[in-house]
Amino acid sequence: MATKAVLLPWLIPSPRHVSLFPVVQLPALETAGWCVRKRRAEDVAVSVAFNPSGNFDISAFENDQDSDKVEPPMPPTTGRYEVVIDNDSIGRLDLSPFQRAIGITSPDDFGVAEPKRYLDRTIGFTINYKREDPGDPRELSEYPDVRLWFVRLDAMYPWLPLLLDWRAGELARYAAMLVPHQMSLRMGVVFNPEALELFVMNKVFVVYPWLKRHGVPKPRLKTSDMARMLGFGIGDELFDLIDHNE
């Protein structure tokens, strides 16, 4: 039986969701080269379910005919920074395609760059990944080498989720590269809820101080919006604690 994850005191389910589980829309799989096979757009969603025995409980959702259908994704933001990677850059853990696309070479470069420019234009990814076996049905987030590239990217630029093209689903796809999950033909990506909670909290602790450090207006709101995109709400008590202990 699927159970709701135990949330931290400051981490509450987003009020926009009526389900017991946080649900996040993934964009159509054919968008931006993130997929290796197509599915119907209405079948693609991110849902959180977890079985205490240690297995993801996907079966609880497969036959739920009353579950909400996921709306088609919005198109990519016009003029966004587009990061194009392929097998070569992935295999060498080469981050230069990202650095060239957005015009920085190290995290320290943001000390002189204007974060608002990246927040306005946003960042997206196109993954040109050629499979050894054309019949391999796995999604890109299920390939270890692809995920490892994103793990390194996230380690170098931990505030990156804030700058992604949220409306086109880039944040949900990015999370799928870093958070344990399984694939469901009906539900799409099914996250481990505890891992998703930790991912969200980690990003809150990174993003909120980063926004304040760069003088970006309304850092609490922007941080909360990021968490809400993944199905969680952040209480002011947590921001107060961060501010008090800086």
Swiss-Prot record:
Segment annotated as transit peptide: 1-59
Record keywords, A-Z: Chaperone, Chloroplast, Plastid, Transit peptide
GO biological process assignments: NAD(P)H dehydrogenase complex assembly
Main location: plastid
Compartments reported by the entry: Plastid, Chloroplast stroma
One Pfam family, short name: Crr6
Coiled coil: none
GO cellular component: chloroplast; chloroplast stroma; chloroplast thylakoid membrane; cytosol
Gene disruption: observed consequences: Impaired chloroplastic NAD(P)H dehydrogenase (NDH) activity, probably due to a reduced stability of the NDH complex.
Function: Required for both formation and activity of the chloroplast NAD(P)H dehydrogenase (NDH) complex of the photosynthetic electron transport chain. May function in assembly or stabilization of the NDH complex. Required for the accumulation of NDH subcomplex A, which is a core part of NDH. May be involved in post-translational steps during the biogenesis of subcomplex A.
Protein name, as recorded: Protein CHLORORESPIRATORY REDUCTION 6, chloroplastic
